[in-house]
Amino acid sequence: DFFEYLLCLYAKNLNFSLEKSQEIITLKVQGNEKAINEFCTSLENMPNSVFVRDFKVQALENESIEQSQIQKNFAKKDFLTSLNSRAYQEKGELIDNEWGEFVNDELCFDGASFEPISRANFNALLDESVSRLCTEQSFFVKNELGVYEIELFKGEWQKDFLMATDIKAIKSAFVCSNENLKLLASLEKPLIKLRFSAIFRSKYQLEFNEFRLKLPHNLFFFALGEKLFEKNVNFLAFTKRENLGADFEIYELDKRLIVLNGLSFINQKARELILSKDDKNMARISYILSRFDERALLLELSQNDDDILLVDKGANLLRLDLPHNAKQLYADICADEVGARLFENYKQNFKLLNGEFKVKNNFFSLLGLVGQMLGLDDETQKAAHKLLELSDSSKLPRGVKIDFRFKENSKEFDYTRTLRSTMSFMLAGVEASNIAYGAVESLVYFLRDFYDELRKKGLAEFAIISGSLFECKSLTKNTLKHLKNCKVSDVPLFI
């Protein structure tokens, strides 16, 4: 919607036609040489969008163009673009962006009342914000996604995300590729989880490797960042105090955009439909499936809900029943003679799990049980996150083969085989990082085999990844690699 609007805006003085398919926008323009050159020059100022994966310009000969009549009511947003940022930076001018929007945020300094940002109060609010931050005080900002408390970053990590005051500040703490830098600076200003540099991680003695970061999203925060960067402030810390909508978060993997969270940039009607439902995740799933005519296998793998393997809006094809305590777990493992012998050997060499488990019937919880066996953490959820972090940081070409399979002559998943193979590799002295990556990789092989069987029966033509478990990059990368014709939706993985 936003990119389509920009194309129409830049072509408004030309005869033009605009055509859209599901993934391609084609703009044809016609005019004299001067007008065409001016149009091409204007494209240089067009903001980069995370959703535009390719952009081509070519000359057409002897082709008539029927003028498009654009009747659409385009969505508007207070984007930071080269138009308003350059006017401020070079001339000190406060102007609207291409959508006729200035700044839609509201500020609060007293903890009680919010004041909308306007041209009249812009500089006064900017000076007050800088003054408060530099005296180690916080203030609040409100927009359509919620209320955030903002303060200087002081090495405290109980925050939701950081904002770099300038693009040059990023390298002081993070390792950022050119691709990620381009995404951060895009029109949408997404959140991206970046890896810390070794020096920064050592300075703060961090036990984690990544943190969420963004760049200023509108003119006010651009101006605020500019003033703070001049004072050698590199980052602001944001804590969300009231949630009205998820922040837009992405990552890129092998030239594919993965939208983790945030509904700000999907089809407006789809967003309204999803948000109107009590079960928003199921509404999101229904919308994803409605966009495809062919039969699809939806891989809905979650960190918070039961997993779903769904074909053509039918019943869940995955039956996964995990144990809720250690007693049940070890009883299931020892149900046959082989498992009993393995258990006796294992308990002589490793500490056994005990107590209750907080699990859902999903692969995230199963990976958490593997992580608990590896001693990554005593809590299933935390152990799962640490196992996924190990997997994502692994440099191994392949991991050990962990057993993921259904029970014999059944469509019920046999979780004991996964844990038994983990125990066997631990007894063999295999490192935790190898088992962690192997578990994620082996899960993908299980999904591939399940999918291939459906393809052979003509029940599925392609697969779609969905769900918060695909926040794990090694899982997503292997899934896209090993499952033929596997698609990524531009709808968020989870809500």
Identify the function of each model-found stretch.
Residues 1-495:
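Acidic, glycine-enriched active-site microenvironments
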